[in-house]
UniProtKB/Swiss-Prot annotation:
InterPro entries: GcvP (IPR003437), GDC-P_C (IPR049316), GDC-P_N (IPR049315), GDC_P (IPR020581), PyrdxlP-dep_Trfase (IPR015424), PyrdxlP-dep_Trfase_major (IPR015421), PyrdxlP-dep_Trfase_small (IPR015422). GO terms for cellular component: cytosol; glycine cleavage complex. It comes from Rhizobium meliloti (strain 1021) (Ensifer meliloti). This is Glycine dehydrogenase (decarboxylating). The glycine cleavage system catalyzes the degradation of glycine. The P protein binds the alpha-amino group of glycine through its pyridoxal phosphate cofactor; CO(2) is released and the remaining methylamine moiety is then transferred to the lipoamide cofactor of the H protein. It catalyses: N(6)-[(R)-lipoyl]-L-lysyl-[glycine-cleavage complex H protein] + glycine + H(+) = N(6)-[(R)-S(8)-aminomethyldihydrolipoyl]-L-lysyl-[glycine-cleavage complex H protein] + CO2. Keywords: Oxidoreductase, Pyridoxal phosphate.
């Protein structure tokens, strides 16, 4: 058959991920944008933006990019290399059942996983309500007054509890007591945190070894890692008598049956909510919790959701007590924790909403009864089972049979916990079935059926819970799945996430989180692997981690990578600890000074303080660059004690500084190391490598540059890359290499989200990653060019260029029209946008980072909105609008405003449909502007009465 004359083959590649799916502007749109910016080509723009002195010499290359289908096939092949056995290892990680309605409507829903930390409360009301439910759940179960909105993991939470204890204790002691029944990873991390701060660790049996007068605090595990359930009330009273603080690490499921830490008198309770519907995922991510007595709420780290009111007096939620956080208090902050595990906290809260108190109690009772049955069978076989009273964990003395039994259990497709050389630990959970118990009995040499044993109760009578929990109606009113689904949908609709609009937050890199990248995280072969399984059962994970590490080394120019840090802040901390350990190993213990520019992110000085360093601040010039005269002077002044400097590159002002190599040379000349914060790596991938320009260590925000979603405030990953001389000092872990220095509970941090970044690298390829960086720079310069004349771009290079973000100055609006940066941010909500980063690193400004994923149409919509806001300010300047009663001061406008009595000197049309706003699919803020002062003065951090829900629904 002859081919028609007008028929031609095309090179259309529908699954070319980099150019057709991830990068927003088309080639034709890029040409249009380049004309606006004033360049003939993308490469010409890059040549003028990235200094030649730091340009990468060789291109990124590791094979052709994969299509989505090819990458998913590769992921499936890798996942299948993991062996999915039933793990009864426990140690803080347990099998759980994620209700499908929660998996589909929260975990797999971009309305939840692509949102940002809820700093803008008006567009975060759904997430904030879910987090308030979480805080209420934690307060109820722990019996304490105030809970935060999650921490990174249980071990990190324990370290934060120790830090609180040292801060608030009346005792002047410098030692902290750790219950030997705490999980090993918790003990390891507490040791890591204490050592740089000069705190002594005392480890032992609290009933035998605790000297209350000699410590500023203590932590107890409840139930213990080996199963013990003990009453700590007397010990807590002794600690209080000596001015010390008591913390309890408690299993929230056990608290459904056991007396709460608060009822024992504990000051702090911490733990993990992993078993509330969040898969183990080879170690994470999971939401840790912390609750404290009311007196200590201002010393608590992390985010804290509170109840306030909006401009109409209606109930509204917001983040409370933010002045205690690291971005304000810097080296004086309670912690370096920046964000935590919001998505997982939401899942855990919905698990409690789904099951209610009776369901949670029934699950706990079932787990306990199964454990009792298991113990009865083992006792019948003649084994010694400890302890006498327990919840879900038992320890069996097996002598020389340990290896044989563990091997037999694996043959039954069950993992048990090896304890020492003669004991075996077994922890049951929600997923444990009768066949599980029977398989364990067979491994121990028995052949029983579950029905042969009638379980008794093996919890201590004096510790049985009598107090109520989850009493708020929210934990009772959504049992039918229809109502549960609608409730989650209503909350999602109140929020603004990437599934609705671009989120141009500077220093946050809110890029595409592609569906193909997200799919594998729910595969059981990834999600159901316990972090402490034998290495040969996690070969898929090991391959993924090794290959991703190699790719990150190629991208950064570093020699080694640690995947352990489970946030950017933890990456900073781990990197600084590596520097500290390096100096100590070389006999330079006295090197403890860290130079940090005034423009640095607040986590930098907070992390340095935690690593035992003294922060010396370096000036920044009017051009936004490090003041080299001051830098040289400080480096010379502290030459004998200089440990390191911390810089961000490109700078936090959105510019590639020409002098970065000189900065590194000055530090090295005076015996220090260079920590380069990788927060802005999205402007460097494929164009410049930190390891090539003089940096010794960096952390990488995989939840920024490498596509892990922000989850509304977590999860994240902050692996660190180091040059070879620092590699021996990367974090260790007691469960793997036995080395010290653990910074996260699990050896590879939040491992189950690493497939996202790996998929991204596979589908983009080296060339695609480089192109993404170039387009990110183009998009930022395009926005700057379009806003020129209306707003000044505060910092630019000598050639007038910005990097991947730009800072626009809104301070003139305050002077000429009384319009604040807050007014601009709230007016953007009316336009359907999340505001750019406000007042950082310069007060009264907006930092805009569009990323490479946004199309020209979306960039234009945002620019149109910003230009319209400038015209509204001009109308105030000219007297055409009232200075107080105008669309900017009254923003955001709600449906209630639209349909209510209208007495404003501007139209409903102007109020609700400004340029940039969609008419059919408009986002409506559910509340008017939130009163921040009221919320802090009238702090309420648990669910309000049911009447307020009814009022909100009317």
């Amino acid at each position: 058959m002859s081919m028609p004359k007008d028929f031609t083959f095309t090179d259309y590649k529908p699954y070319d991920f980099a150019n057709r799916r991830h990068i927003g502007p088309s080639p034709a749109e890029m040409d249009e944008m380049l004309k606006v910016v004033g360049y003939p080509s993308l490469d010409a723009l890059i040549d003028d933006t990235v200094p030649p002195s730091i340009r990468q010499r060789t291109p990124l290359a590791w094979g052709a990019p994969m299509t989505e289908r090819e990458a998913l096939d590769k992921l499936r092949e890798t996942a299948n290399r993991n062996r999915k056995l039933v793990s009864l290892i426990g140690q803080g990680y347990y099998g759980t059942i994620t209700p499908p309605v929660i998996q589909r409507n929260i975990l797999e829903n971009p309305a939840w996983y692509t949102a940002y930390t809820p700093y803008q409360p008006e567009i975060s009301q759904g997430r904030l309500e879910a987090l308030l439910n979480y805080q209420t759940m934690v307060c109820d179960l722990t019996g304490l007054d105030v809970a935060n909105a999650s921490l990174l993991d249980e071990a990190t939470a324990a370290a934060e509890a120790m830090a609180i204890a040292e801060r608030v204790a009346k005792s002047k002691a410098k030692a902290f007591f750790i219950d030997e029944n705490c999980h090993p990873q918790t003990i390891a991390l507490l040791k890591t945190r204490a050592e740089p701060l000069g705190w002594q660790i005392v480890l032992g049996d609290p009933f035998e070894d605790l000297d209350a007068a000699g410590v500023f605090g203590a932590i107890f595990q409840y139930p213990g890692t080996y199963g013990h359930v003990r009453d700590f009330s007397g010990l807590i009273a002794k600690l209080h008598g000596q001015g010390a603080i008591a913390a309890v690490a408690a299993d929230p499921l056990a608290l459904a049956l056991l007396k709460s830490p608060g009822e024992m008198g504990a000051d702090i309770a911490i733990g993990s909510t992993q078993r509330f519907g969040v898969p183990v995922g080879y170690g994470g991510p999971h939401a840790a919790y912390m609750a404290v007595k009311d007196a200590y709420k201002r010393s608590m780290p992390g985010r804290l959701v509170g109840v306030s009111v909006d401009a109409r007096g209606n109930r509204a939620y917001r983040l409370s007590l933010q002045t205690r956080e690291q971005h304000i208090r810097r080296e004086k902050a309670t912690s370096n924790i920046c964000t935590a595990q919001v998505l997982l906290a939401v899942m855990a809260s919905m698990y409690a909403v789904f099951h209610g108190p009776d369901g949670i109690k029934a699950i706990a009772q079932s787990v306990h009864q199964k454990t009792v049955r298991l113990a009865m069978g083992l006792e019948k076989l003649g084994y010694t089972v400890e302890p006498d009273v327990f919840f879900d964990t038992i320890t069996v003395e097996v002598g020389k049979l340990q290896g044989i039994i563990l091997k037999a259990a694996v043959a039954e497709e069950v993992n048990l916990r090896k304890i020492g050389t003669t004991r075996i630990g077994i922890s049951l959970d929600e997923r444990s079935r009768p066949v599980t118990l029977e398989a364990v009995w067979r491994a121990f040499g028995g052949d029983f059926k579950v029905e042969e044993f009638e379980p008794d109760y093996r919890l201590p009578q004096e510790l049985l819970r009598t107090s109520a929990y989850l009493t708020h109606p929210i934990f009772h009113m959504n049992r039918a799945e229809s109502e549960m689904t609608r409730y989650m949908r209503r909350l999602a609709d109140r929020d603004l996430a990437l599934d609705r609009a671009m989120i141009p937050l500077g220093s946050c890199t809110m890029k595409l989180n592609a569906t193909a990248e997200m799919l594998p995280i729910t595969w059981p072969e990834f999600s159901e692997i316990h972090p402490f399984v034998p290495a040969d059962q996690a070969l898929g994970y090991q391959h993924l981690i090794e290959d991703l590490s190699q790719k990150l080394c190629a991208i950064t120019g570093y020699d080694a990578i640690s995947m352990q840090p489970n946030s950017g802040a933890q990456g900073e901390y781990a990197g600084l600890l590596a520097i500290r350990a390096y100096h100590i190993a070389n006999g330079n213990e006295h090197r403890d000074v860290c130079l940090i520019p005034t423009s640095a992110h607040g986590t930098n000085p907070a992390s340095a303080q935690m690593a035992g360093m003294k922060v010396v601040v370096v000036k920044v010039s009017d051009a936004g660059e490090i003041d080299m005269d001051d830098f040289r002077a400080k480096a010379e002044q502290y030459a004998d004690t200089l440990s390191c400097c911390m810089i961000t590159y490109p700078s936090t002002h959105g510019v590639f500084e020409e002098n970065v190599r000189e900065v590194c040379e000055v530090v090295h000349k005076h015996g220090g190391q260079v920590y380069l914060d990788g927060a802005n790596m999205n402007a460097m991938v494929g164009l410049s490598r930190p390891g090539d320009i003089g940096s010794d260590v960096s952390h990488l925000n995989l939840h920024k540059t490498f596509c892990i979603p922000h989850g509304g405030g977590g999860p994240g990953m902050g692996p660190i890359g180091v040059k070879s001389h620092l590699a021996p000092f990367l974090p260790g872990h007691p469960q793997t290499d036995g080395h010290e220095g653990a910074v996260s509970a699990a050896p590879f941090g939040s491992a189950s989200i690493l497939p996202i970044s790996w998929s991204y690298c596979l589908m983009m390829g080296g060339e695609g990653l480089t192109q993404a960086t170039k387009v990110a720079i183009l998009n930022a310069n395009y926005v700057a060019a379009r806003l020129k004349g209306a707003y000044d771009v505060l910092y630019k290079s000598a050639k007038g260029r910005v990097a991947h973000e730009c800072i626009i100055d809104t301070r003139p609006l305050a002077e000429s029209a009384g319009v604040t940066v807050d007014d601009v941010a709230k007016r953007l909500i009316d336009c359907g946008f999340h505001a750019p980063t406000m007042s950082w690193p310069v007060a009264g400004t907006l930092m805009i980072e569009p990323t490479e994923s946004e199309t020209k149409a979306e960039l234009d919509r945002f620019c149109d909105a910003m230009l319209a806001i400038r015209e509204e300010a001009r109308a105030i300047e000219d007297g055409r609008m009232d200075k107080v009663n105008n669309p900017l001061k009254n923003a955001p406008h709600t449906v209630e405003d639209l349909v209510g009595d209208w007495d404003r000197p501007y139209s409903r049309e102007q109020a609700c449909f400004p340029p940039g706003a969609f008419r059919v699919d408009k986002y409506w803020s559910p509340v008017n502007r939130v009163d921040n002062v009221y919320g802090d003065r009238n702090l309420v951090c648990t669910c309000p009465p049911i009447e307020s829900y009814a009022e909100a629904a009317e």
